[in-house]
């Protein structure tokens, strides 16, 4: 069994050290194997300029947050997935780090940027990866990646048992969509969302929906947090459940795939719908006899 969970809270915009300290204070009090933190938990979400995003971004793995979380992970023998803005050369990325008892492991850069994120960040261009952390194999995705079912499918095909999903959800459909993603791939998912709202620089107010959750491979919501309260939740799961892809004795989720029919999924210029149809000739019916 594996003890997994999330920390849902309201990060203070621009207060990197305060946000990191709050996380360390809370995680220091629990016993867990894997904890997921929200997207951009160090910085907050609603940037008003690229310069502001650059100022709050950090290098990975040598930046402040990765170093502090690595110290915690070593002390607690803990794996952590945490979202933060990353600065790499002249590029900025909406990233998530994977940290373990031996320190920094890897980074995932968000593939599908949402709304004004496109003004500050570059989309991630690395392959979707799965990491073996001993008792489980995990993949990472960030927030709006949920809108694209291909992400979880690829991670699942690569053997992921658990999908770690840092998020700053503002759309209401994400939590329920993740239930479907888990069911259609037979994997666990841990969504770590934030609460509160941000309204900066005269921009539209963003209200974050909370509802962080852990979902099972059968689509069962094992736990869903509130919409507006800070919560640190840890529960036990058996990652081996995610390796049972049989739906029944005649159907296997992955073996039954018809990849010969799916070519359009990777075609940047999919075929247009058929517009011409062959009309059947009308046959004249004889008049009924009286």
What are these regions (language model features)?
Residues 8-14:
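Short polar catalytic/cofactor-binding loops
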Residues 16-26:
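Short amphipathic alpha-helical segment that frequently serves as the phosphate-/nucleotide-binding helix
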Residues 24-105, 170-185:
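Cys-nucleophile CN-hydrolase/nitrilase-fold catalytic domain and related Cys-dependent amidase chemistry
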Residues 35-39, 80-84, 108, 141-142, ...:
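Active-site neighborhood of phospho(di)ester-bond hydrolases with catalytic His/Asp-centered motifs
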